[in-house]
Amino acid sequence: MTPSRPSWADPRRRGWPAELAALAREVLPAPMWAYLEAGAREGVTRDEAVDAWRAVRLWPRVLHGTGEPDTRGEVLGAPVRTPVGVAPTSMQRVVHPDGELAMAAGAAAAGALHVVSSNAGHRFSEIGKAARAVDPDAVWWLQAYLTPDREAAAPVLRAAAAAGARAVALTVDTPFPGTKYEPAEEDWQGHDLSWHRANFADPRAARHHRGLRGEDLAWITETCGLPTVVKGVVRADDARRCVEAGAAGVWVSTHGGRQLDRTVSTATALPAVVAAVGDEAEVYVDGGVRSGLDVLAALALGARAVLVGRPPVHALAVAGATGVRALLETLTEELAEALELAGCARPEQAQGLGAPPDL
């Protein structure tokens, strides 16, 4: 439990995520809020993401004697206290002076996976240190865009590995940023945007690769020694190709609805990806998750971990590391209640609740 938890972080209060978002909007610079909330083109994928989780229906179990649930689990063999994690976002030093350092500390305090954007405003070594200062066993991954110039990309991957990253989440849905009707460059006057290049000594490392292939996964692991998770998958056939290329995990994601608009929601895409992957790799999901019930729905459809993107940034803006911890713990408390009501003692037991049982 977070000491002196913020008033909005109360799982008994209906609509607390919207309250948190409203508080964040009050304190964030207007261009940062617009950037954070933007969806690609018409925002259809972004807007449908939230409703898609609410449309999932559950078949709870009874008479299983589960008692109080335990939300602990593992991601790629690393222990976490909750299946709820923090998805990568950039520009965090515009949100809060401590940026990713506060995000890392808050996630570590909650025992949650933290995925760090390659466009972080702090050095990976600083982020890893901030997490370990709270929990020596804190689990964090690097999210990476692979540049076509491997000579430039390799130092970034190795720096993250040296700083304690446990995996590389390779984003594959972004050959270039999709069009968003977000702030114009002049709207950012007075804000230092150079922060999001803290880990790029070579500017070539920030370029996006427009021709990624399966063999790039093996190169990443060979270069930095870390397992590779493929982020940005919504198709079952692509999920199979990821596994066959050596991916340790497949991350169902639409980039927060910020790439190809009208892409299917992650809640809709998840079951087929899980079925295609089987037990050959772990499956994760993000996109529109706003409550512990949403997390349960994702677990029921087969996700190992559930990542949230915008809400942690809202919490960071409002209350720094304390806010991030409070957000994650509140979602986990909601999940624990939902697990017990669904007849599940642990998160992995929720798989299958999203479909009627076979007799």
Predicted regions and their residues:
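Glycine-rich active-site/cofactor-binding loop and its immediate structural neighborhood
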Residues: 81-125
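Glycine-centered helix-coil hinge/cap
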Residues: 29, 278, 319-320
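C-terminal structured "cap/appendage" subdomains that terminate the fold
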Residues: 305, 313-316, 320-331
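An N-cap/entry alpha-helix motif that binds or orients negatively charged groups
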Residues: 2-80, 180, 187-212, 348-350, ...
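Short, basic, glycine/proline-bearing loop/turn elements
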Residues: 85-91, 139-145, 203
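Charged C-terminal helix
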Residues: 333-359
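Conserved active-site and cofactor/substrate-binding residues in soluble primary-metabolism enzymes
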Residues: 15, 40, 44-48, 102, ...
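Alpha/beta enzyme core
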Residues: 105, 126, 130, 134-137, ...
